[in-house]
Design a protein with these regions (language model features):
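Conserved, mostly hydrophobic/aromatic
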Residues: 24, 33, 68, 92, ...
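Canonical Radical SAM [4Fe-4S] cluster-binding loop centered on the CxxxCxxC motif
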Residues: 1-50, 54
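Anionic group-transfer/hydrolysis microenvironments
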Residues: 7, 27, 39, 67-70, ...
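Glycine/small-residue-rich loop that forms an oxyanion/phosphate-binding "nest" at active or ligand-binding sites
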Residues: 39, 43-66, 70-74, 90
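Conserved AdoMet/S-adenosylmethionine-binding subsite of the radical SAM
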Residues: 52, 71-121
């Protein structure tokens, strides 16, 4: 997976707002929003298994964000399934432009969809 960063912080959106979480920020976006605060260039390129090793023992709440996570759909589905099988509380933040399969959405505790008006949208 192409990642920008992995970091711990407090969740700022949704029902887990104010709670500690581990953030996995994926690179790439299909919009070009004016004022975007995310550097979309990847700094890490890890397999799903390598990513899981890096985050092991860092808490039970994981926020998958971006960029736009659904641009790496195959790896995203694999990651969500593996996190789910480990009993993780999974949150995802998306711009809502791509569909996540229903069977995968059912494994996610919270999906925050934040539509944006990019120049290519």
């Amino acid at each position: 997976m192409k990642l920008i960063e992995i970091f711990r912080s407090l969740q700022g959106e949704g029902p887990a707002m104010g709670r500690p979480a581990l953030f996995i920020r994926l690179s790439g976006c299909n919009l070009n929003c004016e004022g975007c605060d995310t550097d979309l260039k990847p700094s890490l390129d890890l397999s799903v298994l390598e990513l899981l090793k890096r985050i092991e023992g860092q808490g039970k709440r994981v926020i998958i964000t971006g960029g736009e996570p659904t641009l790496q759909m195959n790896e995203l589905v694999d990651l969500i399934c593996r996190l789910y099988s480990r009993g993780m509380e999974i949150h995802i933040e998306s711009n809502g432009t791509n569909t996540i399969p229903l069977d995968i959405l059912e494994k996610i505790h919270c999906a925050v969809v934040s539509p944006k008006k990019g120049s290519d949208f």
